[in-house]
C-alpha cells in the first residue's frame, strides 16, 4: 500500500511539474493578461482629452505589449510604455519603483526559470541513485517558483490599480486567461513542492529506521539476551543441577549426628528418673561406637603390614 502511495505521489509530482511549467510559460509568452479600453494609435501633441476618449477601443495586453481588438488598428500591437511623459510621478516614489518592476517582469521570468530547474530535478530523480536528495531539491525549486510567481502577480495587480486616491481616472478592466494561467501555475507549483518535500521526509524516515535496525543487529549488545531473561536462565540452570539438590553442610552436620549421641551427651536433671531402658540403650551405643572406631584402625594396620602394598625403591 505504501509503494502504491509513493507511486501516486511521484505521478502527481511529475504531472504537476509539467503542468506548472507549461502554464507559466504560456502566461508569460501571451498577451491576454488584461482586457481594458485604450488608444491604439500613437499619441500626438494636438490630441486632447476628448479626442482620446472618443478613440478608445477594447484592447488586450500582456507583460510587454498591448494589442487592439476594435477599430481601424484591430490586430495591431505596440510595446507598453510604463513611463509615459504625461504621467505625474516622481522617480523616487513608490509608484516609479512599482512601474520599474512591472516593466522588467523579473518575477514571472524568475518563476519560469525555477520551474524549469524543478522539472529537471523531478526527471533526474527517476534515474539518479540518491533520488531522495534530488526530490528535495525539486521541492525547494517549486516552492521558490510559486513564491516568485505570486509576487509577480501582486506587482502586476498593484500596477494596474494605479493610485487609490484617483478613483475617477481609474479605467475599467478585467483579467484574461493568461493571468489565470499564471495563478493556476502558482497553485500547482506549491502543491508539487509540498508533495516533493513530503516524499523526501518519508524516504528519509525509512532510511533512518533501516539504518537503525541494521545497527542493532550488528551491535554485540543486541546479541545478548536481556538481563531478566539471563537471570532466569541462570536460576533455572542452577535449579536443574544435581548439586543444588544436595543438602547444605550445616544440614549435613545436623543430620549425620545420630539421635543416640544426643541422648548420650544430654544430662538428665533428675538422676532418679533414669530407667533401665536408657541404661541399656547407652551401653549398646557405647559398644557400637567402640566397634566403629576400632575398625578403621585395624584396617589401616592390615594395609600397612601387607607386603604387596609396600613401596619398593629400585636399586
Swiss-Prot record:
Gene3D superfamilies according to UniProt: 1.20.140.150
* Major location category of this protein: membrane
Tell me what topology the record assigns in the membrane: Multi-pass membrane protein
Q: Name one GO biological process term.
A: protein targeting
Q: Subunit notes for this chain?
A: The L-type calcium channel is composed of five subunits: alpha-1, alpha-2/delta, beta and gamma. Acts as an auxiliary subunit for AMPA-selective glutamate receptors (AMPARs). Found in a complex with GRIA1, GRIA2, GRIA3, GRIA4, CNIH2, CNIH3, CACNG2, CACNG4, CACNG5, CACNG7 and CACNG8. Interacts with AP4M1 and GRIA1; associates GRIA1 with the adaptor protein complex 4 (AP-4) to target GRIA1 to the somatodendritic compartment of neurons.
Classification via InterPro entries: CACNG_subunit, PMP22/EMP/MP20/Claudin, VDCC_gsu
Role noted for this protein: Regulates the trafficking to the somatodendritic compartment and gating properties of AMPA-selective glutamate receptors (AMPARs). Promotes their targeting to the cell membrane and synapses and modulates their gating properties by slowing their rates of activation, deactivation and desensitization. Does not show subunit-specific AMPA receptor regulation and regulates all AMPAR subunits. Thought to stabilize the calcium channel in an inactivated (closed) state.
Q: Where can this protein be found? A: Membrane
Stated family: Belongs to the PMP-22/EMP/MP20 family. CACNG subfamily.
Which residues are reported to carry the modification Phosphoserine? 248
Q: Which N-terminal stretch is annotated as signal sequence?
A: none
Q: What keywords does the record list, in alphabetical order?
A: Calcium, Calcium channel, Calcium transport, Ion channel, Ion transport, Membrane, Phosphoprotein, Transmembrane, Transmembrane helix, Transport, Voltage-gated channel
Q: Give the organism's phylogenetic lineage.
A: Eukaryota, Metazoa, Chordata, Craniata, Vertebrata
Residues passing through the membrane, by range: 8-28, 104-124, 135-155, 181-201
Name the chain's protein.
Voltage-dependent calcium channel gamma-3 subunit
Q: Which organism is it from?
A: Homo sapiens
Q: Name one GO molecular function term.
A: ionotropic glutamate receptor binding
Q: Which GO terms describe its cellular component?
A: AMPA glutamate receptor complex; dendrite; endocytic vesicle membrane; excitatory synapse; glutamatergic synapse; plasma membrane; postsynaptic density membrane; Schaffer collateral - CA1 synapse
